[in-house]
Structures are given as structure tokens and as C-alpha cells.
């Protein structure tokens, strides 16, 4: 069932039919059989026309032009042909008819079959939904990964976020505040006393000049009267109330609470501390103190706008001089402001009017207070009497809505703030106490469709619209009573007419202008339920405004809490996956509202009553007919029996094939048929038409000659189909086919001339294959060996001796006459192949004569490429551990196969991998290329067992010093300082979650997981990250498993000398769990290094394009040195000393952020590094050995670690060749040095090198590090031109040119694997064209690539296609040199 479902979802290919079509088989069976026969000879195939879904086959008439004698006459004739109907992608129901002559399927008017249409549409919808589901899963996986990374970065940044900074005060505010305090104190100590002079001496005017004796005279004032009333109240209270010291103290100090100076001090201090601009309030307080406005000014401030506030300042200054004039001035200022600001809008003008009235009232009230000498608390009580009635309505309300000038609610405030509860945090305590510690849900992601909204401009306002089907939809109140509105979409403006107003709903449907055909159409939600809803509208500046909330259905409306801005009415309300729910309408402050839009809201076409009655009658008849359509006739019953027998025969054939390994259809009878066909024998022609059909065609006007020609054409089509069936089933059983006539049925089912057993067995007699001379030597074992066949006990019992003699002879031939997959010199290949073929035929014929199926008739048991791993039982989680291989390991064999003598053989594991590889692919596509330049010095790597022993030499050259740090402390210290400075940006790096690491998941998952899964991607798809997480926790907890590495040799283009010497590179690959553990520690650092290639030495992650190569060479030249060095090692990875590699790894751990440098992480990382240096390696032979040297070439950070080591070596080398310099001098001169580094490749500029630099560094690397540097690999020059880096040579204009063009040619004409098609070959040559662009036009490689591209382009065009891409010189210049700055 799983296989059928999978094939149904994929497009039908050649020879593969959709499972729905195979099962349902709609239409005429004879038409179906005939249709597939015609499809084989047709120029266009049904599999290309219908990608999936059931097909309906039927016979029908087709009018064609009459052709006679090669002349087309304008007369149409009618022929009988096959009509095929189905549903294409996009839910288009189409019908195609086969047209003779052109032999192709041509589209005709559709012949609708309801069942085919219904199932076809469902299949197309299922395919689309399946594609959407896969895409959604991919996006979900990507989003989860991004969320994990962002969460990790967020947690790290939160820890690094500094605390809140202390607020600083402006100098001007501090100075003015000091002035305010001084002024306030001066005003507080100032007092006025009125009295009468008692001295008798008077001057001429009757007034004493100096009064030494006087008495105070208390004039009447409100202050004195209220003070006396207050004292009387206190005296009365003292006589009747019980004695209370606290109460006496409170009543005694009560007047001071209403004191102006205390209030001014508190207000001023609060503004200086908390306000951003306190000067405005300080100015007001100073002027209020000066003018005696005092508390009246504070009460008036909340009701003043900017003009009236300035008016208050002016009035208070005048009030201090003359109170009566100040009252007049306040009136004049208010009138002047009201006249000057007449142009304001109503809202602002109303605020100004209120401010002016407040200004005049405050001035008059201040004059009364001053005149009556009223105390401060009297002023406070008067102000409270004014304000309390205004807020009574607010006190009893639950909330306060603040509306804007347009009447819409801008803000809603809670009228019950409960400040104490809020500040105490009691509510938060309960929330924290009952909140779950683990988050159980996430906010949903939403699907937003950009550029899908239009703007509706009507007379009464503006709104939003969107497309549904072929209508524009908006809110009814946006359009109003208009019948035509203006519509804008991006830069396209058009007009739309009202088509339909939905009854009882505020929804209007408009016509869709022709210019908006590409506007996205919203699809209706299948059901409308409560849940998350999304409102998308046009925001300011054309940007999308998105609101997300929880919606609740109320009748035919939905409410949600989303604020509404101008122009949002008519916006679509959708689900999180973009399905339409309704049309947005209004905002009520707390909730938004939308009208639900359903499928029934579209205008429904009214059907004629007669048509409706007929449809009801047809439905009733079809329902009644369904009970009578099962095998109603004898032909149906016979058909059912034949179909059942066909299925049973297919099952039996498959079971027999699987059980006995029977080869498919290679019989003597079959070869007779094919031989007869090749010799020109013809079978008896069958009937094309029945007698009734033939007479009908004659009556329609066809002549006998025309019908004879049509019959011959039909028979030729049948022959083509049968030939195809013969080819397709040449290695298979004959397929089931319907009989052509009743006579065949009678003969096959009831005839008496049945073959005997002996005549049937004679069909299986082996025949000698005359053509074996083309067999390649590397294919001898595959062609003639018996190990690919199932051999039973009966075979061994009767033919064991013959089989042994045959296999011994075959092994002797292979060992004696072949070497490394090629014939030995002076070998008569023709005689050897004939001899092997004769022995093969003799063995098979002997078995046939004794009644046993020969090997020629048995199926080879070759392993197939599976989409999944081998069949197995349920997996035990312990089998996924890193050290499970130790439980599987058996003791080693007595001898050695692939392990060198100086390496131990620890044990043996069961593994089935090839050891030798002598395959040199022969790609027929290469015959399309013109003759290539000579590249015989290179070829594809091939190897035998000796190559594995040779590959271990990469770890051996010379012995390094026991302690380099101890023997060379000065050089070691300087190298460590350079390392720290060069990679200072690694400080603060982090450890990533193992599930968030990135790695090539298409790589092998090593042993033993490779027994079950081919790649890590397959392993992850089945097991997920559960094994990764559990193993990470186990190791972090203290486990230290031994890790197994799988070794294989690399298939690549090498020099022929290396291939002949079996010098092939080895690659080791560890378990993906181990790789991702290391990646968790190092991926962040690796990413940081890839982003610093422009300014730092390591170049992993760089690009030579867009002037990248030239800029880096210019960076070296900018040091203004005269020494440039091209430096390369031999066996670099394998000979890196353990001491250096351990130092590099220790440095990397020290660069982690402090919170990650825990003891547990350090111990885990140390285990990881130890496993890199002490490796248990599995050979393809099953042998397990141990490697303890070098940087493994398959670990996750091989290149990055090589870069770090290269920087260390270079700094050590620089100090070594300058022994006369101190550490400080070395640091100074190092600033003038620079390098480009990629693994073991290095291009350096030094300020100075000694004359014997090459010899000194060659001996230094050998004696100190035990590494191999060949003198010819160290090139010293005074210019970078001519030196090479990363396979490029620096050209005269500092642009890169390929260094080894012969190797590129060899990889083209002698590739390591075959290419898929001619387009892939064209693309490969195009890559060479790009690489060789900077070569001179006369260069042989560049001229060849240009010619090859043109030749391949012509071939592609001759095949009816077009070359994938055409690259011009200008484009290549831009690619290499970059665009304009």
C-alpha cells in the first residue's frame, strides 16, 4: 500500500502508470488497451500530458484530411480513434484524441466523464496539498532551527546586558534649581507688619521721621478672621475632646501642609529628579512665588496649552507690579490669542479657549486671595470644590475611553488602578506561583500574502479591498451608495463597478478590472471556528499592517481585540494559513469586528426550472442504476474472471521468481521469435475491424483501397507496440495481454494441442553466446563468476565438482592475465574470452541436461540501491551508542590484508565494502567533444589492496621533538602570542545546542550505522535527534566511549605517477553523533573565521570572484615588503605533531565565553580531542587498527584546525629565522608581515628573510616538527606575480589564472564518474570557461573550452533544446572583477 501511494503522488513516468488509473480503469477496456498501444508510437506521450490521476478511454470518430499519393486534398474523412480524458495540473479537464499520420495526441473538445473529473480533481488537490505539506514541514524545521539559534543568542545577550545607567542632570537645570531654592527661601523669611507710632515728636508734616515706640495694628483680613476661627475651633475641641498629644501635634501642624513654600519645594524637586525638561515648571514656580499667584498657578497649569501658558507667565510678571493692570492684561492677552489663532482646527481652538478662560479666572481669583489675605488651605479647598464635581463621573466608571478628533478611541485607561496592589506585586506573586515552569505552546506563525490588497477610493471615504475568485470584495460602508469606485493596486489605478451587495451583511462585491488579473485571489476557509485570526491591511507608506488576535464568533460576525486605523475597513480577516474568514468592519475600543464571508454569499446563478428538474431526475436514475451495474452481462462475468486470473498469475510469477531466482524470459522460444523477426518472418495479420464496422465504413464513403491502407497503418502501429513490448520484456516474463479474437480465446482455453513437458523444457536449453570479445577485464568476475547466483544444496550435490573446477579456472585467468583491472601485456584476450565462454556454456548445458535450471536462467542476486536501509528488526537504543562497535568486534584473523606491519590489528568487524576499484568510467557523452589537448599525465584514481598500506605513509616522515615548548621557549611564546592576536575575534564564542549544529547530512553515517542507513539524512529522518541528545548527555555526565572511524580512499583526478605508485589519499569518517558533538563546541568559531577572510590570514570561506582574489594580493602588497613566499608541505595533515595539535585545541577552548568553560565541558572537550588523536580505524576488509598521529581528514574542523596550525608554524618559523630579535622586536616586525592561508597552502610576505631561508626552514620543519617540506615547494620572490595560491597563479594584473590546466582537461575527458546528460556536460565545460577567463586568448585550454562550448550548444539545439545559459565576456569580467563601485 505504501508503494502504491508513493507512486500515485509522483508524476507518471515512462512505463509507470498512476496507481489510481491502474485501479479504477475508467472507460472502455478495449479503448484503454488500444490507447496504450498507440501511445508507444506517438511523438507525444500520455505521461507528459497527464502527470497523475485516472484516465478515461473511449473510442470515437475523428475527422482527418484525405491523403492520396502524397497529395493532401481539402476533403475530410472520418476515422475511428481513441479518446483519452483526464485532469491536468490546475484542475483543467481535457480530452486528447490520437491522430494517425502525424502520430500524436491532439487536444479536442472535452468529453466529460463525471467520475474521472471528480477523482482527477481530488488527485490534483491531494498532490498540491502534499507538496504544501512538505514545504510547510521544511519551513517549520528551518524556523525551529532559527528559533533555537535566536533563543541561544538572546540568553547570551541577556547575561551581557549592562544594568540601568544612573540618570544625569543637565547643568542648566541644576543652576536654575539652586536659584529657585534661594528665591523660595528669601520669600519665606520676608514678612510685613502694620502698626501705629507712639512718639510725640512730629516733623512739620505731622509724621515722625524716626519711630522708636509703636504698636501693631491688625487690619481686617480674611486670613485673620479664618485664623481666629481656627483658634476658636481648636480651643473648643480641647475642652470637649479627650487629651491626645498626637492629635494636638497634627492639628498644630495642619496649616503648614497648605503652605505654598512647602508645596513649591516638593513640586520643583520632583520635576528636577523625574522630568526630562524641568525648566518649564521651575520658571512657573518662580513666577508664582514672585507674583503671589502661588497655588492658583499650580491649579491652572493642567488646563493651559502652550499659548495660554506663555500668557500666564506674562500675567504673573505684571501681577507682581500691578494687580489691576495684570487683570486687564490677562483679558487683552486672551482676546489677542483667540483672534490670532482663528485658523486652528476645532479641537485645538477649543483647548486654546479653555486656556484663555483659565488664565483670566486664575488672575481674578489670585487678586481676591491677595486682597483678602486668604490662607493657602483656603485656596486648596476652593480648587477642590471646583474640580470634584468634574471627576465624579470618572470615579464611578470602570474605564475611561480617550477619543481622538475623529471620534475613534485612541486609548483606554483602567479607572481602578489599584496602585498599591500593582506596586506590591501581589498579583505577580500569584501568577508566578501557578505558572508552569515549562512552556507548553508557542504563538502561531501566520501566512501573509504580500501585494494582495487594493485601495478603494469612494466619495464617502477610503477603505481596503481584496480579490476572491473574480470579484473585488470590500466593506459596504466604504462604497456607500456609489455604484462606481476608484481602485488602486500598486501603481495601477482603475475603476470597478458594484456587482452585488450581500443581503444583511456589510459586504460589497465589485468587478475585477482586467489589469488586476495577476492579483492574488484569497481562498475561503473550509470552516469558521473560534481561534487565532489575522487582519492584513494597507499601512502608512504602502507597507502591510498585520494584526493577530483571538477571534470569537458572535452570530454572523467575529470579534477580536485589534485596533483599527483609518482605511482598514474592508480588509481581509484570515486564518493563520491565509484562508479567508470575513471582512473587517469597525473598532469598538476593546474589540474589532468583522462580518463572516461564506461561499453562499456569492451571487448564485439562477437555473431554469426545467434544468433543475432534469438534474434531479438524472440523479435519481443514477442512484437507482447503481444497484444494477455489477456484472450485468456474460461478457462482464468473463472479464472479471480473466482479471482475477491475470492478478493471480502475476502473484505466482513474482513468488516463483523470488523463490528460485528464475531469470526473466531468456528462453529458447523467445529467441526463436526474435530470430524470426530479424530474418524477416511475419506473423499472420489479425483483423482490424469487425464485419459490422467494415460495412459501416463502406456506407460512410470509404473505398476498399482507403480501408486497406488504414488497416496496414493500424497493423504497423501494433507491430511497433509489440516490438516495444518484446524489448521491454526481454528480461522479464511475457506480460498479460487481452486476446485479439474469440478464436484465440477458444484455442488457448479449450484447445487440445497443448505442449508436452519435454517440448516446454527444450525452450530453456542454453545456447552459446557468440559475442563475448567486448568484455572488459574489470568485468570478468561480474560476468562469469557464480557468487552472484543462489546455489542450493542439490546444486552442490550433483555439480559441486564441476563448479569448483570452473571457479578455479576463472580465478587463475583473472590473477594471471589481468592487473589492476587491465589486461596484462601480450595477452591474447580473444582466446581467453572464448575459453571462458565455452566453459560457462558447458557448465550450464550440463545442468540443463540433468533437469536443473541452468545459471543462464537464474537471476543474479546483486544488491540493489534501496531508498531505505536493509530490513531489520526494531532498533535497540544501545546499538546507537558510540562504543557499540566494541560489542560487535571479533578477534582478528591470523594474517593481515590492508593494515601495515607497524600498525596493530585489534579485531575484526563484519562489513561488506569493496576493496579494489579499477573502474575508469567511459562516458559516451564525451564523444560529443572536439579532440582535447593532451592530458595523459593525469587520470582518475584506481587502486588495489596495496593502496591502503601505502596511504598510511602520510603519518610518517621524521620524529618531532619530544617537547617543542621546552626546547624552543622563545619561539613557542611568540607563536602563542601571534595565535592569540590573529584570532582575537574568537573570544566569547559559545557552545551550540547539538540539535542546532549544521553539517552535511548527505554524508555517510559511518559504522555500524551504515549497515542500516546510507546517509545521515536517512538516519535523522527515521531516528531524529534522540540518539544525539542521549549520547551527548551520557558523555557530559562522565562516559568516555571509544569512537570508531571508517576508512576509505578518495576517488579523484591524480597524476598517473601517483596512481601507478598506489599513492591514494585516505579519508576517515566518524559517527555523526561524534561529529556533531565536536561541531557543538567549534561551529560558532568556524563561522566567525569564515567571516574574517578579508582582514585575517585564514581564507576558508573566501571567494576569488568579484575582485576577491585581487584585493587579497593587494593586501599583501600594502605591507610594502620585498619578499613574497609560496609555501607548501607534503603530508601536512598526517605529520602535524600531537603537541601542536593539542595546543591548538586548548587555545580554541580558551576562547569560549566564561560561562561555557565549566569543568564538565572541559572534560568532554578533552575526550573529543583525545578521540581525534587516538583513533580506532575500520578498514574495508573488516580489520580494526589504531592511528595516533596527525589531524584526521574527515573530522568536522579539519581545514580550520589546519589554518590555526599554519599560523602557529609561520610565527614559530619567523622567530626561528630571526634569532637575534627579542620578543618585543619580533612583535614590531611582525606587524609588517601578512599571509593568505588555506589548509597547507600559504602565500606569505615577510619584511626580511636570510639568504639561506629555504634550507633553514626545510631543516627546521624536519628536525623540530618532523614535517616534510620539499625545497622545490618553497618559492621566494620579490613580487607575488607568478606565485600560486589555492590552485590559482597570480597574473600580471593580479587576477587569478588556473595553475594546472592539464588537470582540468583530464577531469573532463577522463572523469571519475559519468555525467547525467548533455546539459550536465555543457555546465561542466561552462565552469571551465569561467575558471579560464583570465587566461590569454591564445592559451590552448581557453581556446579548447570555447570551441567545446559552441559544439555542445549546437548539439543541444539540434536536439530541439537550448543551452542552459550563455555567458558573455562582459558578464565574466563583471564576475571576476566586480561591478562599478
Curated annotation (Swiss-Prot):
<keyword id="KW-0472">Membrane</keyword>
<feature type="transmembrane region" description="Helical">
    <location>
        <begin position="169"/>
        <end position="189"/>
    </location>
</feature>
<keyword id="KW-1133">Transmembrane helix</keyword>
<dbReference type="Pfam" id="PF00680">
    <property type="entry name" value="RdRP_1"/>
</dbReference>
<feature type="active site" description="Charge relay system; for serine protease activity">
    <location>
        <position position="477"/>
    </location>
</feature>
<keyword id="KW-0067">ATP-binding</keyword>
<feature type="active site" description="Charge relay system; for serine protease activity">
    <location>
        <position position="569"/>
    </location>
</feature>
<feature type="site" description="Cleavage">
    <location>
        <begin position="665"/>
        <end position="666"/>
    </location>
</feature>
<dbReference type="GO" id="GO:0075523">
    <property type="term" value="P:viral translational frameshifting"/>
</dbReference>
<keyword id="KW-0808">Transferase</keyword>
<keyword id="KW-0547">Nucleotide-binding</keyword>
<keyword id="KW-1043">Host membrane</keyword>
<dbReference type="GO" id="GO:0005524">
    <property type="term" value="F:ATP binding"/>
</dbReference>
<feature type="transmembrane region" description="Helical">
    <location>
        <begin position="279"/>
        <end position="299"/>
    </location>
</feature>
<dbReference type="InterPro" id="IPR043504">
    <property type="entry name" value="Peptidase_S1_PA_chymotrypsin"/>
</dbReference>
<feature type="site" description="Cleavage">
    <location>
        <begin position="662"/>
        <end position="663"/>
    </location>
</feature>
<dbReference type="InterPro" id="IPR009003">
    <property type="entry name" value="Peptidase_S1_PA"/>
</dbReference>
<dbReference type="InterPro" id="IPR043128">
    <property type="entry name" value="Rev_trsase/Diguanyl_cyclase"/>
</dbReference>
<keyword id="KW-0191">Covalent protein-RNA linkage</keyword>
<keyword id="KW-0812">Transmembrane</keyword>
<dbReference type="InterPro" id="IPR007094">
    <property type="entry name" value="RNA-dir_pol_PSvirus"/>
</dbReference>
<keyword id="KW-0720">Serine protease</keyword>
<comment type="similarity">
    <text>Belongs to the astroviridae polyprotein 1AB family.</text>
</comment>
<feature type="coiled-coil region">
    <location>
        <begin position="121"/>
        <end position="160"/>
    </location>
</feature>
<feature type="transmembrane region" description="Helical">
    <location>
        <begin position="249"/>
        <end position="269"/>
    </location>
</feature>
<feature type="region of interest" description="Disordered">
    <location>
        <begin position="856"/>
        <end position="879"/>
    </location>
</feature>
<keyword id="KW-0175">Coiled coil</keyword>
<dbReference type="Pfam" id="PF13365">
    <property type="entry name" value="Trypsin_2"/>
</dbReference>
<dbReference type="GO" id="GO:0003723">
    <property type="term" value="F:RNA binding"/>
</dbReference>
<feature type="modified residue" description="O-(5'-phospho-RNA)-tyrosine">
    <location>
        <position position="694"/>
    </location>
</feature>
<dbReference type="GO" id="GO:0039694">
    <property type="term" value="P:viral RNA genome replication"/>
</dbReference>
<dbReference type="InterPro" id="IPR001205">
    <property type="entry name" value="RNA-dir_pol_C"/>
</dbReference>
<dbReference type="GO" id="GO:0006508">
    <property type="term" value="P:proteolysis"/>
</dbReference>
<feature type="site" description="Cleavage">
    <location>
        <begin position="436"/>
        <end position="437"/>
    </location>
</feature>
<feature type="domain" description="RdRp catalytic">
    <location>
        <begin position="1122"/>
        <end position="1254"/>
    </location>
</feature>
<feature type="site" description="Cleavage">
    <location>
        <begin position="195"/>
        <end position="196"/>
    </location>
</feature>
<dbReference type="GO" id="GO:0008236">
    <property type="term" value="F:serine-type peptidase activity"/>
</dbReference>
<dbReference type="InterPro" id="IPR045835">
    <property type="entry name" value="Astro_1A"/>
</dbReference>
<dbReference type="GO" id="GO:0003968">
    <property type="term" value="F:RNA-directed RNA polymerase activity"/>
</dbReference>
<protein>
    <recommendedName>
        <fullName>Non-structural polyprotein 1AB</fullName>
        <ecNumber>3.4.21.-</ecNumber>
        <ecNumber>2.7.7.48</ecNumber>
    </recommendedName>
</protein>
<dbReference type="GO" id="GO:0006351">
    <property type="term" value="P:DNA-templated transcription"/>
</dbReference>
<feature type="transmembrane region" description="Helical">
    <location>
        <begin position="365"/>
        <end position="385"/>
    </location>
</feature>
